[in-house]
Every structure is written in structure tokens, then in C-alpha cells.
């Protein structure tokens, strides 16, 4: 794994406190990916940019009835610290879970 000091806390947190995986690590960027339930894909792309800040692209996608995922949300956030990145990762997991639960509830309502 090729990473530097910019990702130490993030990697530790993801590995020990989430069900997400770290893919494609580089010296200035990492990609964090995981499924939430069967139908939600959560990806957080993190790159160290100017002044050592973190640019985070959060991609939350839904897989409906076909085999392809459709992006539902894709905000870009720039934060200053690893702790802020960790908060964004937690928020993306929470939003993904809410999306999954909402879709399941709507599907259930339609089937009743």
C-alpha cells in the first residue's frame, strides 16, 4: 500500500470502524468503496490538494432493476483535516443507509 501521513487516521478508521474497503491507494489519493445492503454503492474518492487539504468526491449510487448503478448523489467537498474526512465518510454511510431504507419502504408500500 503506497500512502503517506495524510491518510493514517482515515485508513485506520475505515479498516476498523466501517465495512468499506480501501482501493487504489497512492501517495496523494485513495478510493474507499463499499456496498450498503444489496442495492447501494458508496464510494469516497479522497485526494490531497493545495495546502494539504482534502478534496472528497462522494458518490452514492443505486442499483435498481438492471445491472448498472445510477448515481443519486455526487457532492464534492474540500476539508482541512482527516477528522473532517472521517465525518464525511460517516455521513456518506448514514445517507446511503437512509436511501436504502427509503427505497425498501417505498417498494413495500407499492406492493401492499
Q: What is each model feature region?
A:
Residues 1-39, 68-73, 99-112:
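Negatively charged, low-complexity tracts enriched in Asp/Glu with abundant Ser/Thr
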Residues 38-88:
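Intrinsically disordered, low-complexity regulatory segments enriched in Ser/Thr/Pro
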Residues 81, 90-101:
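Charged, terminal alpha-helix-loop-beta segments
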